[in-house]
Amino acid sequence: MSVETFTPAPLHFTQGAASKVKTLVDEEGNPRLKLRVFVTGGGCSGFQYGFTFDEDVAEDDTIVEREGVSLVVDAMSFQYLVGSEVDYQEGLEGSRFVIKNPNATTTCGCGSSFSI
């Protein structure tokens, strides 16, 4: 009898998010840009997500690649994001990158604030 161990990806970068990052990077004309996801203190639930584009990668950053583009997370933020999904959604309320975080015990209606 064999036993298989399943190790989930530490961070899931969806096809939709990667496609949007690729479009935005192409529009900027700078292939060195990467989507940086970070967590800061604040928001109505204690922590909040942030997104920015960055050319630099620190030694302790985690990098997830998909479709030729990269998502980058700093070491401090990564501990709060393990197992999360980074996606891109378009709807009546507008378009935005979103994080589905299984570690969050409380989230705010805005979708960008959470607590653990």
Swiss-Prot record:
Record carries keyword Transmembrane: no
Cofactor binding note of this UniProt entry: Binds 1 iron-sulfur cluster per subunit.
Residues that bind iron-sulfur cluster: 44, 108, 110
Database matches in InterPro entries: FeS_biogenesis (IPR000361), FeS_cluster_insertion (IPR016092), FeS_cluster_insertion_CS (IPR017870), FeS_cluster_insertion_RrpA (IPR023063), HesB-like_dom_sf (IPR035903)
Kinase keyword on record: no
Keywords: Iron, Iron-sulfur, Metal-binding
Subunit text: Homodimer.
GO biological process, alphabetically ordered: iron-sulfur cluster assembly
GO MF term set: 2 iron, 2 sulfur cluster binding; 4 iron, 4 sulfur cluster binding; iron ion binding
Superkingdom assignment: Bacteria
Cellular component terms (Gene Ontology): cytosol
Highest classification ranks of the organism: Bacteria, Pseudomonadati, Pseudomonadota, Gammaproteobacteria, Pseudomonadales
Cofactor(s) needed by this chain: iron-sulfur cluster
Protein name: Iron-sulfur cluster insertion protein ErpA
Biological function: Required for insertion of 4Fe-4S clusters for at least IspG.
Name of the coding gene: erpA
Family the UniProt entry places it in: Belongs to the HesB/IscA family.
